[in-house]
Design a protein with these regions (language model features):
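Metallo-beta-lactamase
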Residues: 1-36, 78, 82-95
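Active-site beta-strand termini and strand-to-loop segments that position acidic
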Residues: 29, 48-52
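Active-site metal-binding loops of divalent metal-dependent hydrolases
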Residues: 40-42, 60-61, 102-104
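Divalent-metal (often Zn2+) His-rich catalytic cores of metallo-beta-lactamase-fold enzymes
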Residues: 49, 84-122
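Residue-level marker for buried hydrophobic side chains located in beta-strands
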Residues: 55-57, 99
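Short acidic/His/Gly/Ser-rich catalytic and metal-binding motifs that mark active-site loops
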Residues: 59, 64-68
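Short glycine-enriched, charge-decorated loop/helix-capping segments at active-site entrances
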Residues: 69-76
């Protein structure tokens, strides 16, 4: 084991654990955040919605530029079609603000999602 990583615990082959879900398979809230499965970037990618503040933490579902939603980075997205299709969930969440990992925050993302889907499903 490298001295650089001596404080890390070896996880073996199980790197991630599934999120808790109910009997119907709906993902359980975590600290007030509701997770939604949005595969495409990776098979288990999720976004989190904070309903009280109407904020989506979108991770790598999108990138953004100048307040506009953009496709995720192609070189780091396993299935672009699936990622784009999964982004339709934004229409149902009534968010006023979305944070992405790569780009600036986006205000009122629901107002952009139809155009985003139209442009990127060609």
């Amino acid at each position: 084991q490298s001295s650089l990583y001596r404080n890390r615990i070896y996880l073996g082959k199980q790197i991630v654990n599934p999120l808790p879900a109910n009997a119907e398979g709906r993902l359980s809230k975590i600290a007030g955040l509701t997770p939604y499965l949005t595969p495409g970037h990776s098979p288990g990618h999720v976004i989190y919605y904070h309903e009280k503040d109407k904020v989506i933490l979108a991770g790598d579902l999108f990138t953004s530029k100048k307040g506009k939603l953009q496709k995720p980075m192609k070189m780091f997205t396993a299935d672009m079609k699936e990622a784009i299709a999964g982004s339709a969930i934004v229409k149902n969440l009534n968010a006023v603000h979305i944070e992405v990992c790569h780009g600036d925050p986006v205000k009122n993302p629901g107002s952009q999602i139809d155009e985003y889907l139209r442009e990127n499903n060609r």
